[in-house]
Every structure is written in structure tokens, then in C-alpha cells.
């Protein structure tokens, strides 16, 4: 069973009940109001968290205690925290109620202080309340946290009146909730959910002493008295009453009894606590007379004299009476379980209905059979027997039913629960109106009566209008309404009575139109034409010229053009007659249809005549195909002639289009009309064939396109070649070299033409010394050096006379022609220049070149010199045998090649390069090596104990390389299996130890050079027998040598410069015995477990590698060596440089 917890913060005790049993009133059939205490236990996870926190109460050494203060006085609460195990100051918070943080309330009436005593290492936190007020009373909480540690403490503050007696208190004003102050203020006031009503004036009642009523009343009557006299703060009233009735008789069995009542939310947890006078008494708990047994729902705890009952997951069935017995005595209490607020889960929806229909407004709430209230425009709906409103409940559904809806029912309806509300609008419309007899159009003679009559389905009034204006009754005009029939009677019809009449029933958006026509002489209405009665039509379109006419009887219309009458029929040009118009129709207008047309109207009332001018306009003809007169790299110039026919309207301008020849998509080049007959298209792709065409534009539109122009290709020559230089000169030739042009273009590059001319043959004059401008030479004086175009950028001009001076230029040629020439900056003398020879020995040949027997030797030695030098090779001063060694020479290098090297090829090779009288020599040492021969003689010098002393002589043949060591092997005479004893041994004598006594051994020795071991080994002729019997060998006694040595650096650190981003290393060497411990430091701080550094120590050499250093890694680095005999340090500086990008 868990440890009992402290009484909940929000548990408020109620006065003890009087001796009367409240169950008697229950039996009488009444529902008494109960004394209760509000218990709001945090459910689930929050409670578990608080229980866990209470178990970690390890921070407070002194907790604040509850207290009592009078109004206007001061009080201080103190909390202390031990700081021995804390590295920093803990965090403390003061709360009032559950969540009100008092840190933001500090000021005139509240001060928070904190101090720290260094000797005792105790933090003291104080909360001082200055000039306390009534609303300061309540439950307070202090919380302290440090990292993962937490501690909390709750305490109560009671504020008493400083003076006065209880009967003088206005209890009804003191305990009305204001919604401010304590944490439970306004908690029981549900007036915010009720509709605001007008305050009714009540008759003044005589003054009543409510305290006396409460003191003498039963606890079951407290709530009744509180609501009767307007007391809403029931909890505060019970607290005050409890303090007034403290002189209660104490029980012999209970030192502290149950509170009169408890309240808890549904699903919450409640705790009942009693304190026994004698802890040995047996306690039993009962619910409604039934004994409670321990379970997961009911948990019993014992804490000293306290007996505690926990009820988990409280439900509505737990709302009942509980009592506890101890011996012959018992104490009881009431538990009230408060249901959660009812929420609206499905909102009301706006509804539209017709008058007389049944309307249903439906919503859903979170609980079945919940109590909800309906409102209409804020007024509560109370259904009754005579009311048209009914309310139906189906589980969670609540439906408001309105029978026979009227326009008065259109309003905003809302539903309200304890936890939410919803509203919707109801619109009630009239029934659709049916037209039984509509109005009809009428034609009347002048002076006759006009009667407009209609019949509708409803007996409602209406309004008459003529041409949108209300009809005014007069002696001649009467409006008649009889039941569903409406009439408009006009006597003695006049011409102005003609028009559109409309009847509109009231309250409906319905109109009944009718036209009245009064007979009149024929008229031709030409208001829709121009001032000169001209009609313009586009050729190819259909002309339908409708001329409004009037007259009664309808006049006969006759159309004519000149002397030719136009008849009705199916021809291209025809007329059509209608009661109110006559129409001239031309199906496909042509240019020849232009002219003056006449219309004649005739009826019994008279005649009318009119003339109309018809003008037929057309698109212009397409222009003639344009001509491209000039072409550039990305542009051209084009011209064209205007079209022969402008379509009867002046040409406004032209549109130009172009396309690639291989494409079918035309692209417009101008969006503003081109007024001229010439245009320059730009931004074309060089080397691509194009076509262009023209559109003519007049006021009617755009003509058809002209025929495309002949295809043309924008091309441009390349830029001149660049960097023309002299590559070489001989007595009869000049070799020139150049670079390709910077800009080649779409026409590409077909090749180059190299030209030259002799100095003095013309008036050659150089414009500048850089050769960028042309020489002042006639074109016929230049000689083409290459008959055909050349692709390479190097060419040799041959057949030149010696000592002549020539000018040279080069041109780039493509499909557009030859580019501007590139000139050499000065005349060239045709005479070969002697260049002294020079041998470029490769670096690896400046030392002895070593190869093994059988490997190939291939050495390339470059040289310089002009004209081509003469080369001579010698080996050790003698001519080289070309049958064994191949020599190949070129203009720039010589190659010595030996396919399969032999030891006889070793020696000194001399190379001589000669140009005219200039000579250059160089030497190369070649060493061909092979495996050595075996040692000459191997002897056994001495045998003693388990040891054998061997000596041998070096081999006669060292393989043309120095002997680097020997390998010694031994073999037992029985098995003759050879085992290596010593490898890479440098001396010619050795002692073989740890041989097996009683065995007989043979020994052999291999020679070794840089090629490897000798193929054969020399074996001892005689064997060495390790005798079993012999003298006992006694090891001589030597004094132990002291190898201890303090650390000493044999190679110091040096100052180093490193490049940022490249690994850097610091090296030093140290000696000492015992082996010293190495520690690296940067700026006097030891480097430990840093991934940017790696430390190595091998055979006394200490290395610190800094991976990809940055300027931050610069500084002073120190290597420290420590052993038992001493400590030594050495420093250096590292600077990291950043290479600018």
C-alpha cells in the first residue's frame, strides 16, 4: 500500500453536521442540499506526476507553514533549501491556487526575497504579504527545482477581520462571487450561461440575520438558505460558518472526523481522512450502509493515527453517503460527483422553408438525454400544450419542431448546454405564385379601348407600370382588382398609350409583361445609322441591314438600287419583310455591291421613303515578294513594293515575318506597324538559311502573306589569326606558327593561306611595330606560300634565297571569304641561326643507374642545338658495340636501349653533342647487378655446452653489389631439415646457441646483397656434436648495470609553418629509462581525446599530427616527458597560413 499523501490543496472542509441524520429527509421523499467540500484531484498522468514529485522531496530542509493574519497586517512565509550538493542556485516559484504564478504579482502588497548563507550553505526564500486583504486568503504552493530534482509544498493562508462581530457582516454581499481574487472565484457561478433578463423591481423585504438562520439550520438546508438570500459563494460561506462553530463536541474515538461533504469531478480521485484518538481501534468504511472492501477502486492507507480511504475514477454511482466506524462511534460525509459540461458535437444548420410547412432544427450533444435549452432571438422557448413549438429528444439528438411555419417564425434559433452553444437562422418564404392567365400583347386602333387582363393563384394586390413607370389612374385609365383577377382599362386609345405594360404582384418577384400597339402611318426608323445613312461592310461577310418600320396595317416595303428593284427570294441580294422591320440581305458582299439603296413603305395611312449608302471594304492584296539586298553575319536588308489593291482603305503599315528554310514556323519580327517599304531584320543565326515575307495592313485587317523571298544565309568572315610567330629559320626555309582566330563564326574555318613578299621589291612600309595594321603593299606583290588551304597552324616556306628578308602574313578562309590578314611584326632574315648544344640530363640519371641482370635499359637524354648536332657515345672511353647496345638519335633527344642487361654492360657512358665548333659532354654511370655467390669456406671453430662458434669467408663474387648480410641455417643430421637461425647477419662469425644436447648438427651460410640471397649456400664439412657429458658450465657473476636515466630530448621541436587545410606534424625524440610518459600540450593545456590530433611514439620518436589545421590551431605547442627520475619539456611555435583563393 503506498504512503499516504498530504491533503489535497483544493480540499475545503465544511462544518460538521448536527446530530440529526440526513437520511430521514431522504426517506420523506425530499432531495436535501448537502454540505460539501470541493475536491478537484488531477486525474491520470497529472496525479501520477505529483505522486512522483512528492517522493523526491529531498530539497526542502524547512517548508513554509500555513498561517492566519488579520486584515491590514503583514505575514511572511519562509522556505529553506540545503545547497551542499548543488552546483548552482535552485529555481523556486510561488503559486496561489493551481496556476497563478506570484512572480508577476510582486509589488505593493507582495515581495519575494532570497538570501544565501555561505557558512551553512543554505538558501532562504521568503514571500512577504503586506497589508493583507480578504481576497488574499486561500491555498498557496511553493515549488523548487534543480535539474531533475523537484520538491513542492502547499500551505494555507486565512485572513480574519480585524474588528467587528459576526452579526454585523453583510453575508449576502460578502459571499457574492466577483470573478476575481481567489482561485475558486466564480467557480460555482453558472449565471454566464443564462439569458440576461430585465431586472424586476421587488418589494423590500425585512432585514434578516442570515448567520442566525445558518447556525440554527440543518446542514441539509444550507444550500436552500444560500440561494434564497442570494449567496453564490457557497464555499466561502461554509468556511466562515465552520470558523464560527469551532466549539463542537469532540469525539472519544475520533481526534479528527470527516468533513461534512466532498465534491469531485467525474473520473477524478477523492481522499477521505479521519484521525483516531486510539490507533489500536479497528476502522471500517461504509457506502450507503454497505461495507467497502479494498480493491483497485477503493484503497486504504494507514499513517500513524490517520486512516485514509482513496476512491479512484469516481463515477455518478459513487455520488452517495459514506461513513466510517471506530468502535461504537461513527462519522459520515457526503460525496458529490460533478458531471463534465455538456458539449454541442453537431451544430445547428441554417434552414429555409415555406409558409405553412413543418420545420425541424436538429443538433447533437456529447451525452445522452442531456438537459438543453432552446432560444429564439435570445428568448427562451418554453414548449406547452398550446405552443406551436415541440422538442423531441432521441439519445444525443435534440430536435426543435415548428408546426405550420409563418413569416413571424423567421429568426435566429440557438441551443445552449452547460458547456457550449450553437445557433442557426431560419428563413420562411412565401409559396410560389402561379400565373393562371397571363397578359397578352394588344394592337388597337386609335380611339379604341385597351383592356389588359390577367389572373394569378393568390388574392393579393399588385402594381401596374408602363415602360418602367407607375401607372396613374385617371378618367381615361382605370385599374380593377377583383379577387384573383386584375385588369387595366384604357378608354379612347391614343398614340402615347403604346408601350410595354407590366403587372407585378406584391410580395413576389414576378412580373407579367404585355405590349400595346396603336395603329400609326408608316415610318422608317434610321436612328441606328450614321448621319449620312452609310453602312460599311467587309467583303466576303454577310450584310443584314435591318431597318425598323412602323404602321398599321403593316406597310409594304420595296427596296431598289438605281432602276433595279430588289425582290424577296433566295438570291444573293434579297429582302426580308417583318411586321416591325424590313431587312436588306447580301449573303457574300463583293466590291461591286457598293452603292445607294432605296426603301419605300406604303399602307393605307400613307407612304415613307429613305436612301441608304452601302460601302463594301476588303483586306488589301498581298505585297510582292520582298527582295534581300544586303546580308551580314546576323542581319540583312530587305525591300518590297506596296500591294496593287488597298481594299478600299488606306494601307496603315506592314508586318514582317521570317523563318528558317528547314522550318515551317514563321516568327513575326515587328509588333508595331512598319510604315516604310524597307526593313532590317536582326538577331539571326549565322550560317542558317532564312526566308522572309510581308503582310499589308489596313483598317479592315491584315492581307494574306506575300510570297517568301529567295532563301539567304547570314554569314561573316572570321577574325584574323592570332600570335603569328617564327618557329624556325634555315638557309632556304622559314617555318611560321600561329593560333586560330578568336572568332570563327557559323561559316566555320576551311583553312589558312600563308603569303610572303621580299623586302625591297615594293614600297613596303610598316604601320606599327606590333604588326596589327596592314603593310602598304600591292596585292600582286604578295606570294602565296601554300597552293591549297592548310588545316594546321604551322607551315614551312621553302625555296627562299639565303640572306634575303621577307614579310609574312596569314589569312583565315571560310565560306564567306578570307579574313583580315595577320602580319608578322618585322622582316625575317633567311639565314639559319647557330644554337650552342646543351644536354639536359634527367635527375634520376645524375646518380648511378642500377638495374638487375635480364632487365631492359631504356634511357632518354634530351638535348638542344641548331643546326642538328652530331652525337657520339662511348663506354669507358671506347666505342660502343652497337650489336649489344642500340642507340637512336633524333633532333631533340638520344636514346640508349639494352633489351636484356648483362653485368658486362656496367660502366661509364659518355655522350658528346657537337654543333659546329661548340661541344657539350655528359656522363652516365650504369650498374648491372646480380645475386652474389656463396661464402667461400664455413668452419666450426668451437663447440661447448649447447653452443657452436662458426666462421666463414666472404664470397668471391659479390654480384656487382655490396654484400649486405648473411643467413645462417642449421640441420639435424638425422632429418637434414634446414631451419633458419639468423637472418641479415653482417659479420663473418657467429655463435649458435640453444642447441639440443645429444644431437649432431650441420650448418650452412647464404650470402645476401640488394638483389637477394645467393642461389647456393656453403655447408660445413664436419658436423658439431652436442655432447651429453661435460663440465658444468657456470655463468660468471656480473654486477647489474644501472640503465636508469632521467628523460632527455635528443631532437628538439622546431618552429613550424603550416598551410591551412593540409595536415601538419611536429616531431621530436626523447630518451629515458624507465620509458617516459609523453604528454602534448597546446598553450599550456593538455591535448586529450581531441579527434583533430593524433599522437604517435615509436622507438623514442614522438609525433603530433594536426589534421587539416586552421588559423585557430596556431599557438605554442609543448611536449612533456615524465618518468620516476624527472620531468623535461620542450616547446615550439606553430603558425597556420591561409592561401588566398
Swiss-Prot record:
Residues 1-10 have a biased composition (Basic and acidic residues). It comes from the Eukaryota. Keywords: Actin-binding, Cell adhesion, Disease variant, Immunoglobulin domain, Muscle protein, Phosphoprotein, Repeat, Thick filament. Residues 72-144, 251-340, 341-431, 432-520, 522-619, 837-931, 1047-1141 form the Ig-like C2-type domain. Changing residue 238 to R: In CMYO16; decreased binding to myosin; no effect on actin binding. Residues 1-51 are annotated as: Disordered. GO terms for molecular function: actin binding; myosin binding; structural constituent of muscle; titin binding. Disulfide bonds: none annotated. PROSITE patterns: FN3 (PS50853), IG_LIKE (PS50835). The modification Phosphotyrosine is found at residue 823. Residues 622-721, 722-833, 934-1029 form the Fibronectin type-III domain. One of its GO terms (biological process) is cell adhesion. InterPro entries: FN3_dom, FN3_sf, Ig-like_dom, Ig-like_dom_sf, Ig-like_fold, Ig_I-set, Ig_sub, Ig_sub2. The modification Phosphothreonine is found at residues 406, 798. Interacts with USP25 (isoform USP25m only); the interaction prevents proteasomal degradation of MYBPC1. Thick filament-associated protein located in the crossbridge region of vertebrate striated muscle a bands. Slow skeletal protein that binds to both myosin and actin. In vitro, binds to native thin filaments and modifies the activity of actin-activated myosin ATPase. May modulate muscle contraction or may play a more structural role. It is linked to Arthrogryposis, distal, 1B: A form of distal arthrogryposis, a disease characterized by congenital joint contractures that mainly involve two or more distal parts of the limbs, in the absence of a primary neurological or muscle disease. Distal arthrogryposis type 1 is characterized largely by camptodactyly and clubfoot. Hypoplasia and/or absence of some interphalangeal creases is common. The shoulders and hips are less frequently affected. This is Myosin-binding protein C, slow-type. It comes from Homo sapiens (Human). The gene is MYBPC1.
Amino acid at each position: 500500500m503506498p504512503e499516504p499523501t498530504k491533503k489535497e490543496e483544493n480540499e475545503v472542509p465544511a462544518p460538521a453536521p448536527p446530530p440529526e441524520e440526513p437520511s430521514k429527509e431522504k426517506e420523506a421523499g425530499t432531495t436535501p442540499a448537502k454540505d460539501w467540500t470541493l475536491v478537484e484531484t488531477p486525474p491520470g498522468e497529472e496525479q501520477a506526476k505529483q505522486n512522483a514529485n512528492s517522493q523526491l522531496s529531498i530539497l526542502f530542509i524547512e517548508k513554509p507553514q500555513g498561517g492566519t493574519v488579520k486584515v491590514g497586517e503583514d505575514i511572511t512565509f519562509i522556505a529553506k533549501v540545503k545547497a551542499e550538493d548543488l552546483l548552482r542556485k535552485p529555481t523556486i516559484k510561488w503559486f496561489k491556487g493551481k496556476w497563478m504564478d506570484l512572480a508577476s504579482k510582486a509589488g505593493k502588497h507582495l515581495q519575494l526575497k532570497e538570501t544565501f548563507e555561505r557558512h551553512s550553505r543554505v538558501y532562504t526564500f521568503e514571500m512577504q504579504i503586506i497589508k493583507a486583504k480578504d481576497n488574499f486568503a486561500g491555498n498557496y504552493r511553493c515549488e523548487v527545482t534543480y535539474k531533475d530534482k523537484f520538491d513542492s509544498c502547499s500551505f494555507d493562508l486565512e485572513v480574519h477581520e480585524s474588528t467587528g462581530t459576526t452579526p454585523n457582516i453583510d453575508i449576502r454581499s460578502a459571499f457574492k462571487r466577483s470573478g476575481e481574487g481567489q482561485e475558486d472565484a466564480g467557480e460555482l457561478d453558472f449565471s454566464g450561461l443564462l439569458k440576461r433578463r430585465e431586472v424586476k423591481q421587488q418589494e423590500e423585504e425585512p432585514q434578516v440575520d442570515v448567520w442566525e438562520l445558518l447556525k440554527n439550520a440543518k446542514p441539509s438546508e444550507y444550500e436552500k438558505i444560500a440561494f434564497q438570500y442570494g449567496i453564490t459563494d457557497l464555499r466561502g460561506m461554509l468556511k466562515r460558518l465552520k470558523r464560527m462553530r469551532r466549539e463542537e463536541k469532540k469525539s472519544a474515538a475520533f481526534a479528527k472526523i470527516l468533513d461534512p461533504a466532498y465534491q469531485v469531478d467525474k473520473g477524478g480521485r477523492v481522499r477521505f481522512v479521519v484521525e483516531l484518538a486510539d490507533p489500536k481501534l479497528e476502522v471500517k468504511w461504509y457506502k450507503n450502509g454497505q461495507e467497502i472492501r479494498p480493491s483497485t477502486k477503493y484503497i486504504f492507507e494507514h499513517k500513524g493515527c490517520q486512516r485514509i480511504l482513496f476512491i479512484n475514477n469516481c463515477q455518478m454511482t459513487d455520488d452517495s453517503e459514506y461513513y466510517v466506524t471506530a468502535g461504537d462511534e461513527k462519522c459520515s460525509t457526503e460525496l458529490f460527483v460533478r458531471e463534465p459540461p455538456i458539449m454541442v458535437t453537431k451544430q445547428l444548420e441554417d434552414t429555409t422553408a415555406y409558409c405553412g410547412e413543418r420545420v425541424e432544427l436538429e443538433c447533437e450533444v456529447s451525452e445522452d438525454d442531456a438537459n438543453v435549452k432552446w432560444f429564439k432571438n435570445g428568448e427562451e422557448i418554453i414548449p406547452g400544450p398550446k405552443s406551436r413549438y415541440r422538442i423531441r429528444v432521441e439519445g444525443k439528438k435534440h430536435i426543435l419542431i415548428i408546426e405550420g411555419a409563418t413569416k413571424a417564425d423567421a429568426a435566429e434559433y440557438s441551443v445552449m448546454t452547460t458547456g457550449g452553444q450553437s445557433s442557426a437562422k431560419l428563413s420562411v418564404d412565401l409559396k410560389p405564385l402561379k400565373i393562371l392567365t397571363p397578359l397578352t400583347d394588344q394592337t388597337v386602333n386609335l380611339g379604341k379601348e385597351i383592356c389588359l387582363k390577367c389572373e394569378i393563384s393568390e388574392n393579393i394586390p399588385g402594381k401596374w407600370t408602363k415602360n418602367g413607370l407607375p401607372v396613374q389612374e385617371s378618367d381615361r385609365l382605370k385599374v380593377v382588382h377583383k379577387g384573383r383577377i386584375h385588369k387595366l382599362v384604357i378608354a379612347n386609345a391614343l398614340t402615347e398609350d403604346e408601350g410595354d405594360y407590366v403587372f407585378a404582384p406584391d410580395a413576389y418577384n414576378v412580373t407579367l409583361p404585355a405590349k400595346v400597339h396603336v395603329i400609326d402611318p408608316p415610318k422608317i426608323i434610321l436612328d441606328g445609322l450614321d448621319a449620312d445613312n452609310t453602312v460599311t461592310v467587309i467583303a466576303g461577310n454577310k450584310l443584314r441591314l435591318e431597318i425598323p418600320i412602323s404602321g398599321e396595317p403593316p406597310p409594304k416595303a420595296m427596296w431598289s438600287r438605281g432602276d433595279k428593284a430588289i425582290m424577296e427570294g433566295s438570291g444573293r441580294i434579297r429582302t426580308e419583310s417583318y411586321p416591325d422591320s424590313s431587312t436588306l440581305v447580301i449573303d457574300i458582299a463583293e466590291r461591286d455591291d457598293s452603292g445607294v439603296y432605296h426603301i419605300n413603305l406604303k399602307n393605307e395611312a400613307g407612304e415613307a421613303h429613305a436612301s441608304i449608302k452601302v460601302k463594301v471594304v476588303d483586306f488589301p492584296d498581298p505585297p510582292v515578294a520582298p527582295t534581300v539586298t544586303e546580308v551580314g553575319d546576323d542581319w540583312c536588308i530587305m525591300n518590297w513594293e506596296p500591294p496593287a489593291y488597298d481594299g478600299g482603305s488606306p494601307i496603315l503599315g506592314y508586318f514582317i515575318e521570317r523563318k528558317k528554310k528547314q522550318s515551317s514556323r514563321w516568327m513575326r519580327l515587328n509588333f508595331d506597324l512598319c510604315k516604310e517599304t524597307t526593313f532590317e531584320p536582326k538577331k539571326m543565326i549565322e550560317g542558317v538559311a532564312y526566308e522572309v515575307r510581308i503582310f499589308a495592313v489596313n483598317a479592315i485587317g491584315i492581307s494574306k502573306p506575300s510570297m517568301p523571298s529567295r532563301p539567304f544565309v547570314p554569314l561573316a568572315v572570321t577574325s584574323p589569326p592570332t600570335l603569328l610567330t617564327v618557329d624556325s629559320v634555315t638557309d632556304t626555309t622559314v617555318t611560321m606558327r600561329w593560333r586560330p582566330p578568336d572568332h570563327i563564326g557559323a561559316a566555320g574555318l576551311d583553312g589558312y593561306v600563308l603569303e610572303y613578299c621580299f623586302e625591297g621589291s615594293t614600297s613596303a612600309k610598316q604601320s606599327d611595330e606590333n604588326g596589327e595594321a596592314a603593310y602598304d603593299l600591292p596585292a600582286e606583290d604578295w606570294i602565296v606560300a601554300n597552293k591549297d588551304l592548310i588545316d594546321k597552324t604551322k607551315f614551312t616556306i621553302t625555296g627562299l634565297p639565303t640572306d634575303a628578308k621577307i614579310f609574312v602574313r596569314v589569312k583565315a578562309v571560310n565560306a564567306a571569304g578570307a579574313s583580315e590578314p595577320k602580319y608578322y611584326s618585322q622582316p625575317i632574315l633567311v639565314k639559319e641561326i647557330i644554337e650552342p648544344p646543351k644536354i639536359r640530363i634527367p635527375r634520376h640519371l645524375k646518380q648511378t643507374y642500377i638495374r638487375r641482370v635480364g632487365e631492359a635499359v631504356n634511357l632518354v637524354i634530351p638535348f638542344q642545338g641548331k643546326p642538328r648536332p652530331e652525337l657520339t657515345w662511348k663506354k669507358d672511353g671506347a666505342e660502343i658495340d652497337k650489336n649489344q647496345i642500340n642507340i637512336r638519335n633524333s633532333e631533340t633527344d638520344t636514346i640508349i636501349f639494352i633489351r636484356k642487361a648483362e653485368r658486362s654492360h656496367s660502366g661509364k657512358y659518355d655522350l658528346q653533342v657537337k654543333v659546329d665548333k661548340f661541344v657539350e659532354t655528359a656522363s652516365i654511370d650504369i650498374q648491372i647487378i646480380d645475386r652474389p655467390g656463396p661464402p667461400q669456406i664455413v668452419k666450426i671453430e668451437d663447440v661447448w655446452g649447447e653452443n657452436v662458434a662458426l666462421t666463414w669467408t666472404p664470397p668471391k663474387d659479390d654480384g656487382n653489389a655490396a654484400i649486405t648480410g648473411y643467413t645462417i641455417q642449421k640441420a639435424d643430421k638425422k632429418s637434414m631439415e634446414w631451419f633458419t637461425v639468423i637472418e641479415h647477419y653482417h659479420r663473418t662469425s657467429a655463435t649458435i646457441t640453444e642447441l639440443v644436447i645429444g644431437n649432431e648438427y650441420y650448418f650452412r651460410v647464404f650470402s645476401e646483397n640488394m638483389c637477394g640471397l645467393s642461389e647456393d649456400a656453403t655447408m660445413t664439412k664436419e658436423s658439431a656434436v652436442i655432447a651429453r657429458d661435460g663440465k658444468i658450465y657456470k655463468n660468471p657473476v656480473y654486477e647489474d648495470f644501472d640503465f636508469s636515466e632521467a628523460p632527455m630530448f635528443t631532437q628538439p621541436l622546431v618552429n613550424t609553418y603550416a598551410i591551412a587545410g593540409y595536415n601538419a606534424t611536429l616531431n621530436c625524440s626523447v630518451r629515458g629509462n624507465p620509458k617516459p610518459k609523453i604528454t602534448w600540450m597546446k598553450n599550456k593545456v593538455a591535448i586529450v581525446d581531441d579527434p583533430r590530433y593524433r599522437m604517435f611514439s615509436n622507438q623514442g620518436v614522438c609525433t603530433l599530427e594536426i589534421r587539416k589545421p586552421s588559423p585557430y590551431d596556431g599557438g605554442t605547442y609543448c611536449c612533456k616527458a615524465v618518468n620516476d627520475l624527472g620531468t623535461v619539456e620542450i616547446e615550439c611555435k606553430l603558425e597556420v597560413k591561409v592561401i588566398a583563393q
